[in-house]
């Protein structure tokens, strides 16, 4: 499934701002927050906490629920309906998307977070939306790893990212308990990719530090790593696994970023994540980079993310000048 947001050059920025303000007023009201907080208790009749039951009913996943849980459904419809209208998404599109359990986990965590802390910048969900796990050899048994995956799923974590190559059974178990299994690394053993796909991996993040193979390989200290990364991207795309590519932005490769963007577009990459090294770029270089990210998100086919919350400030400033709103990583 390709993840995207609506790019509509005819969107009225003032209308969006009004919708955002309406959403903040609704969610920020003491009544809505009290109702959401009260809904986090487990319903003995329905078998889950009331918020999850009401959301599942709204999404059409449950039909027979008790009266107390049913009373929450209008609150859910109001909160969700106002939020999706900001990005031009229909209720049917949302309901279709949320049939996958990991999307529902994320929605539950977001609504719980709204009840606990309201709208904060950066926003704090009730549970981490994603957990990254670097499994070290022989630290834990298979059973212990499976048990920890179960705990994360029960806590409400929607995505789990395994760092490096792991046993495919862990990917399968994460998929079985309703999480979104991901892998991240510099490249992958091409012979293992089919196993990972069969186990249920949904998303991979692959590092690419340069358009020049020699520069990339020397930076990471491994021969043929650039070639492996590109082949991994191609093979995962063939298997319909969502591909994100990451680059650590420094003075050494800043001028290459536009070229890397063009290469990744040719390879059919869905997301491009730029990790900006603290203190390495000048303020003006960072500003120009964030402007590039903004314009690529508005005009390009590939979405670009960053670990730097300053993109939110840049996007807000540009939007005030009549341009479109984009989702940013922390803002």
Regions found by a protein language model. Name each.
Residues 1-127:
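Flexible, acidic/Gly-rich N-terminal and inter-domain linker regions that tether
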Residues 34-41, 53, 57, 147, ...:
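Charged/polar, solvent-exposed surface patches and flexible loops
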Residues 70-79, 181, 279-288:
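Short N-terminal helix-initiation segments at or just after the protein's N-terminus
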Residues 116-144, 150, 158-163:
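N-terminal pre-triad scaffold of radical SAM enzymes
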Residues 131-137, 272-275, 323-331:
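Short, intrinsically disordered, charge-balanced linker/junction segments flanking boundaries
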Residues 142-163, 167-282:
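Radical SAM/AdoMet-radical enzyme domain recognition
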Residues 280-331:
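A C-terminal junction/extension of Radical SAM enzymes
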């Amino acid at each position: 499934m390709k993840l995207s947001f609506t790019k509509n050059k005819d969107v009225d920025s003032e209308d969006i701002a009004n919708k955002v303000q309406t959403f903040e007023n609704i969610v920020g009201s003491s009544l809505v927050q009290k109702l959401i907080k009260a809904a986090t208790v487990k319903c003995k009749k329905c078998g889950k906490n009331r918020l999850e039951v009401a959301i599942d009913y709204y999404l059409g996943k449950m039909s027979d629920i008790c009266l107390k849980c049913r009373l929450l459904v209008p609150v859910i419809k109001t909160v969700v309906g106002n939020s999706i209208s900001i990005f031009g998404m229909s209720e049917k599109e949302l309901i279709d998307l949320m049939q996958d359990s990991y999307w529902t986990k994320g929605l539950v965590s977001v609504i719980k977070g709204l009840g606990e802390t309201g709208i904060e910048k950066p926003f704090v969900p009730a549970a981490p939306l994603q957990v990254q796990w670097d499994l070290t050899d022989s630290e834990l048994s298979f059973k212990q790893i499976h048990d920890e995956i179960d705990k994360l799923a029960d806590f409400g974590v929607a995505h789990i990212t395994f760092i490096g190559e792991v046993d495919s059974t862990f990917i399968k178990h994460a998929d079985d308990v309703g999480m979104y299994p991901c892998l991240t690394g510099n490249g992958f053993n091409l012979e293992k990719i089919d196993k990972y796909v069969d186990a249920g991996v949904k998303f991979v993040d692959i590092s690419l530090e340069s358009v020049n193979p020699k520069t990339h390989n020397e930076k990471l200290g491994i021969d043929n790593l650039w070639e492996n990364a590109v082949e991994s991207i191609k093979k995962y795309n063939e298997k319909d696994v969502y591909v994100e590519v990451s680059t650590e932005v420094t003075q050494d490769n800043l001028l290459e970023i536009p070229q890397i963007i063009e290469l990744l577009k040719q390879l059919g990459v869905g997301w491009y994540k730029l990790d900006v090294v603290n203190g390495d770029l000048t303020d003006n270089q960072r500003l120009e980079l964030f402007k590039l990210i903004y314009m690529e998100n508005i005009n390009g086919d590939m979405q670009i993310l960053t670990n730097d919350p300053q993109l939110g400030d840049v996007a807000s400033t540009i939007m005030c000048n009549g341009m479109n709103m984009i989702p940013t990583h922390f803002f």
